[in-house]
Regions:
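Conserved S-adenosyl-L-methionine
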Residues: 1-78, 83-91, 95-96, 103, ...
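A conserved structural/catalytic subdomain of Rossmann-like adenosyl-cofactor enzymes
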Residues: 62-191
Length: 191
């Protein structure tokens, strides 16, 4: 979803065939841990003629941020796994994924992540530490509260958090909070 949508948007903004070719070959990168989801994502990109699926079947958290930064990403989109973090495995908290994504982007890059609302508060000590590091090194621009049925049947209240990478959050910064729960859509189960 994210890569396909991003590719289509970028292609619509491109003026020349050379720009379109460059977008398809060099400007889209993705990481997927699960091999079955990786296969679906790669097939979708190939079917949409992306030219070169820069997808990797790997653990994104094992990638060194400096290594990923060399790809020159100016936008990061992420939907990390929900509710996987524990005291024994704090690296799996959503805030850990957010911090790693932001650290992996270029200076001034923008990131949008969709996570459970509860993860943004950071309840555990580990989550509080991730949150502190994020705010120390990056700026939270705003949070959009989504419809509770965005992920039908999951029972979570999703939000989209928007960040600017590598610009420390100013304590006087006014963040935008948008309530988009009434998005005008009606959820119909598997219709």
């Amino acid at each position: 979803g994210f890569l396909i949508s991003a590719m289509h948007r970028m292609l619509m903004m491109a003026d020349t065939d050379a720009q379109k070719k460059n977008i398809k070959k060099k400007q889209l990168h993705g990481f997927e841990l699960q091999s079955n989801m990786f296969a679906v994502a790669a097939a979708n990109m190939i079917l949409r003629k992306d030219g070169n699926s820069n997808l990797e079947c790997c653990d994104f958290l094992r990638k060194k941020p400096a290594q990923v930064q060399m790809k020159g990403a100016t936008v990061g989109l992420m939907n990390p796994p929900y509710s996987q973090g524990t005291k024994a495995d704090p690296e799996q908290y959503e805030l850990s994924f957010i911090e790693h994504l932001l650290d992996s982007l270029t200076d001034g890059a923008r990131a949008a992540v969709i996570v459970p609302q509860s993860s943004m508060t950071g309840k555990s000590k580990a989550e509080q530490a991730f949150k502190k590091n994020i705010m120390k090194n990056h700026t939270l621009e705003g949070v959009i509260t989504c419809n509770t049925d965005t992920f039908y049947g999951v029972g979570t209240n999703p939000v989209i958090a928007v960040f600017t990478a590598h610009e420390p959050h100013d304590a006087d910064k006014v963040c935008k909070f948008i309530d988009f729960r009434d998005d005008g859509y009606e959820v119909r189960a598997h219709v």
